[in-house]
Design a protein with these regions (language model features):
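Residue-level preference for short coil/turn positions at secondary-structure junctions
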Residues: 18, 124, 220-223
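Short linear sequence signals and composition-biased patches located at protein termini or domain-edge surfaces
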Residues: 2-6, 45-48, 54-58, 71-77, ...
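Short, exposed beta-strand "edge-strand" segments with a Pro/Gly-rich flavor and a Y/T-containing core
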Residues: 19, 82-83, 191-194
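Aliphatic-rich helix starts adjacent to a transmembrane/signal segment
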Residues: 2-5, 11-71, 75
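Extracytoplasmic beta-strand-rich oligomerization domains located immediately C-terminal to a leader/signal peptide
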Residues: 42-189
Length: 246
């Protein structure tokens, strides 16, 4: 009898202990899941913050490089080369790649070919300018340049003497425009081909100043260009002042 009671008591203790252990295990698993969920949420938040910071850093880098290129090209163009002076855009003419050559034989009125020292690397449809004796003639190429020959679209209306300097004249424009989603961007256009410099900006503003520090709207009087760019979601305004070469 005693042995039976002892056995039944032992069985009850075993069941109780087993039940308690199972409950403890379930609580431990639940606590572990809560900790795991919190950890995953923290990791996700950290990842999103990291990616946002990376995008902001990349955007700032794009802006810095874009403004450096704008400054270099405006300085290369110099005073008197501006073609567009607007609040949201600036346009100018410049020989961006330094292509130049010299006429080796006089070209008469009506000719469409210029004999030059070296015409290689001069692309079809580019604008060129020939200068001599304080006079310049603007022309357009009909085809890619050859080793000693440049072919122009229209017959010459005036003679060009031997020794005249010839150079490429690129048409450059920096401007802001929204894409199909309404995101404002800063773009660079060279001879009709445009590329995006900086995406997701809040504002781009150009202003123009003469040698006396007065705001002007006539391209011929501009001696200094100021560009201001505000990046979206960052509250950062970047200002670049560019003095033009005279």
């Amino acid at each position: 009898m005693r042995s039976g009671r002892q056995a039944r008591g032992m069985h009850r203790r075993i069941r109780t202990e087993a039940g308690t252990s199972l409950i403890e295990l379930m609580f431990a698993m639940a606590a572990g899941l809560v900790v795991l969920g919190a950890t995953l949420q923290a990791l996700s938040s950290f990842q999103q913050q990291f990616m946002r910071q990376q995008r902001e850093v990349a955007q700032q880098q794009d802006l810095r490089i874009g403004l450096e290129v704008l400054e270099q090209e405006l300085r290369l163009a110099g005073s008197g080369s501006l073609t567009t002076v607007a609040l949201d855009s600036v346009g100018f003419s410049a020989n961006l790649h330094g292509l130049s050559t010299t006429v080796t034989a006089a070209a008469a009125i009506g000719q469409t070919a210029l004999s030059v020292e070296d015409g290689r690397g001069w692309e079809d449809r580019k604008t060129i300018v020939a200068c001599w004796a304080e006079r310049c003639e603007t022309l357009a190429l009909a085809r890619d340049g050859q080793r000693h020959l440049l072919t122009i679209r229209q017959p010459l209306t005036g003679a060009i003497p031997s020794g005249a300097a010839v150079s490429i004249l690129n048409h450059v424009r920096y401007y802001s425009r929204r894409d199909d989603q309404g995101v404002l961007r800063l773009l660079r256009q060279v001879d009709g081909g445009a590329s995006v410099l900086v995406r997701d900006i809040q504002e781009v503003r150009f202003s123009y100043w003469d040698e006396m520090g007065q705001a002007v709207t006539q391209p011929a009087f501009v001696k200094r260009v100021v560009v201001e760019v505000m990046l979206s979601h960052q509250g950062i305004r970047t200002v670049r002042e560019i003095s033009l070469r005279t």
